[in-house]
Each structure stands twice: as C-alpha cells, then as structure tokens.
C-alpha cells in the first residue's frame, strides 16, 4: 500500500503522483484510492468506461469552489484514462458532495434496479457519514468533526482494502492530503486520534508505505531519492535489508533540512 501525501491542487505534486501511478500500473496495480467519497469515485469509474466526458464534467461542476475543482485534477484524470485505462478508483472519504454526486449515484443505482445492492448501501453510508460530519462542523464543533472524519477515512480505507485482499493479492496506491498520510501522525484539528495512515499502519504494519510529497525532491540529495519498499544497506561490513517506512517534513524547525526519511533495518544488532 503506497500512500502519497499532497498539498491539494499542487501541480508538481500531482505530476509526481501520476508518474508513480503509471509505474505501479505498469507493474500490474489497478486500484487507486482517493480522498473522495464512495459515490464520487464510482461515478469516475463509470466515466472511465464512457465514450465522452459528460460524467467527468458533472464531477467538476459539483466540486467547483473546492480544491478538488482545480483543472490540474481534470488533466490528471484524463491522463489516467488515456494511459492507465483499467484503473479502478476507490473513494474512502466521507461523501462531501452528497447533495449532488452522492444522490446522483443513488438515483443511477435505483434506475438500474440496484437499490438493494452493496453499492447502494455503501454509497448511502458515505452520505450519512458526511451528514454527521457537517452536523458537527455547522454547530462549531470542528474538533469533533475532524476526529469523526479521520476515523471514517481509516475505516473506509480498511473496508476497501480488505475487500480487495479477499479477491486478489495486489499493490494499491492512495492519494490524500498530507495531514492524513504520516505513519506517526495525529488528526489535524486537535491531535487526539491517530490520522488515517497511522491507523492503517497499526493494523497492517510495514505493508503501509507513505511519502510526503511536500518534501520536494529537488531539496534532497540525489542519493536519497525515494525508493519504495526496501533496499540493502551495508553496516559494519555486513549487508542488511532495510524497509522504507515513510518521511517527515521537518523544514519548519530544522533550518535548511527539508525532511527526514525513516528505514527499519531488519535483523541488525549493534553492540
């Protein structure tokens, strides 16, 4: 599970995400997790099979006024459709666009006679999650809203991943705001619950790999260009396997240092 933490609508980061997805896709991956609601992602999956861009245009009409409405995302999706046509999107956020895309998807399923389907039930749950989140937010309970959403994102991700695991053994990739992807991070608003990636790491361990794209590659020495997964290191004349755990942006307090990268060295005892 490769997680990439972005600054939303940052063109350079989105270009990196596309490159990473194309690499994983070429290696056989097909499942891309997004910071979107379930219904929103399902409608994007329908667009992937469509001959025109009607559904994509409806998506961007719905999300106008948000960071997700940036044209850089439209380009991102169109390049995925062109270069990685078998991509399947998985939306694991609450359904922020429940008044538009959420009910649009429910209406579609109803017309198809699928009101009793698992897809309908999951879309409805995502909508209900959003309603509860905004009930907290509109009441001025921002901390409660943030905690609730973070837990929903983790639970929804686990549900989708576990369902995939039951069908096939495959790598997946996820694109989320960087506040959700630190393996040791806490929720943004009040830091009282583990963030999404932290919760995933607690359940799946080193299967979860995370990179914060806010740490610009140009600011890192060439030899530290990220390597996903694992590599070998020589320590005291012996070769060991090191597992990549993720990165942390430390620029705010470390002066010229942009970030630090964490590796776990297997079976290495130093005396």
Segments (PLM) and residue ranges:
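Compositional signal for N-terminal targeting/processing segments
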Residues: 1-271
């Amino acid at each position: 599970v490769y997680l990439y933490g972005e600054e939303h609508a940052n063109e350079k980061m989105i270009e990196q995400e596309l490159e990473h997805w194309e690499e994983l896709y070429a290696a056989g991956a097909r499942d891309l997790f997004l910071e979107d609601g379930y219904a929103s992602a399902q409608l994007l999956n329908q667009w992937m099979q469509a001959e025109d861009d009607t559904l994509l245009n409806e998506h961007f009409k719905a999300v106008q006024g948000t960071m997700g409405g940036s044209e850089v995302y439209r380009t991102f999706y169109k390049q995925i459709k062109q270069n990685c046509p078998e991509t399947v999107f998985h939306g694991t956020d609450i359904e922020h666009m429940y008044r538009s895309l959420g009910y649009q998807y429910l209406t579609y399923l109803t017309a198809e006679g699928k009101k009793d389907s698992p897809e309908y039930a999951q879309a409805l749950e995502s909508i209900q999650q959003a309603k509860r989140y905004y009930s907290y937010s509109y009441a001025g309970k921002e901390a409660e809203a943030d905690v609730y959403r973070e837990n929903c994102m983790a639970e929804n991700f686990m549900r989708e991943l576990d369902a995939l695991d039951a069908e096939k053994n495959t790598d997946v990739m996820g694109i989320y705001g960087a506040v959700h992807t630190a393996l040791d991070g806490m929720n943004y608003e009040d830091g009282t619950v583990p963030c999404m990636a932290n919760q995933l790491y607690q359940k799946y361990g080193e299967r979860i790999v995370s990179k914060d794209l806010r740490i610009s590659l140009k600011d890192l020495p060439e030899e530290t260009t990220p390597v996903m997964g694992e590599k070998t290191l020589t320590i005291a004349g012996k070769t060991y396997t090191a597992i990549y755990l993720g990165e942390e942006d430390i620029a705010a307090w470390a002066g010229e240092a942009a970030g630090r990268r964490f590796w776990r060295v297997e079976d290495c005892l130093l005396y």
